[in-house]
């Protein structure tokens, strides 16, 4: 009989092993066997919990996205009520230390690539994109008409993705301060044009 809570413990252990395996070997090298070896468990247990490599990547990305959504919610709740503060909170969550760690960044890159070919991953990416745009648009809408807010949100979302992608591909540790500065300057410019 399995121990109570063992499922959650094993899944967390395997997701962590997946993040670190992708970090070290890339997605191609992140086989069920290599993840199992890193987690010091049998390949059969990985298959039991996730089915196959696609299921493992999907579960790993659900975990990463949940962390991002929780960080976004936490930062938005802590921010002042004005649009600038709320927008900066969303930006800060996207450049949070957890989201810009090597294992998570490499997993994001693998996920984006795979999401173009795998419907379950495409759906996750769609939900993530909609959530980001919804948050940004809602906050910009407090300072400008809805159509302008949509354009501003689209621009900031593209800037977040672009800064994140450049940082991920730079081969250097992610420069969070520089990314925050550029994104926050954009927010200030857009909002200043409406004041």
Curated annotation (Swiss-Prot):
Location of the HTH tetR-type domain: 8-68
Keyword Metal-binding included in the entry's annotation: no
A Gene Ontology molecular function term of the record: DNA-binding transcription factor activity
Residues within the DNA-binding region(s): 31-50
BP GO terms, sorted: glycine betaine biosynthetic process from choline; negative regulation of DNA-templated transcription
Source organism, top-level taxon: Bacteria
Annotated pathway: Amine and polyamine biosynthesis; betaine biosynthesis via choline pathway [regulation]
Signal sequence bounds: none
Protein's UniProt keywords contain Transcription: yes
Keywords: DNA-binding, Repressor, Transcription, Transcription regulation
Function: Repressor involved in the biosynthesis of the osmoprotectant glycine betaine. It represses transcription of the choline transporter BetT and the genes of BetAB involved in the synthesis of glycine betaine.
Protein name in the entry: HTH-type transcriptional regulator BetI
Organism listed in the record: Paraburkholderia phytofirmans (strain DSM 17436 / LMG 22146 / PsJN) (Burkholderia phytofirmans)
């Amino acid at each position: 009989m399995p121990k109570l809570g063992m499922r959650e413990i094993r899944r967390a252990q395997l997701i962590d092993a997946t993040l670190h395996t992708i970090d070290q070997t890339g997605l191609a090298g992140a086989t069920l066997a290599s993840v199992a070896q890193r987690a010091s468990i049998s390949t059969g247990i990985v298959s039991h919990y996730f089915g196959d490599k696609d299921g493992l990547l999907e579960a790993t990305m659900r975990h990463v996205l949940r962390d991002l959504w929780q960080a976004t919610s936490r930062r938005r709740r802590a921010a002042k009520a004005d649009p600038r503060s709320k927008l900066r909170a969303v930006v800060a969550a996207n450049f949070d230390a957890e989201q810009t760690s090597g294992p998570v960044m490499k997993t994001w890159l693998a996920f984006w690539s795979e999401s173009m070919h795998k419907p379950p991953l495409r759906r996750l990416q769609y939900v993530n994109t909609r959530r980001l745009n919804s948050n940004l648009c809602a906050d910009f809408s407090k300072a400008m008409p809805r159509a302008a807010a949509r354009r501003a949100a689209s621009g900031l979302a593209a800037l977040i993705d672009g800064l994140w992608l450049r940082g991920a591909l730079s081969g250097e540790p992610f420069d969070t301060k520089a990314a925050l500065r550029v994104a926050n300057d954009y927010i200030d410019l857009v909002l200043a044009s409406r004041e």
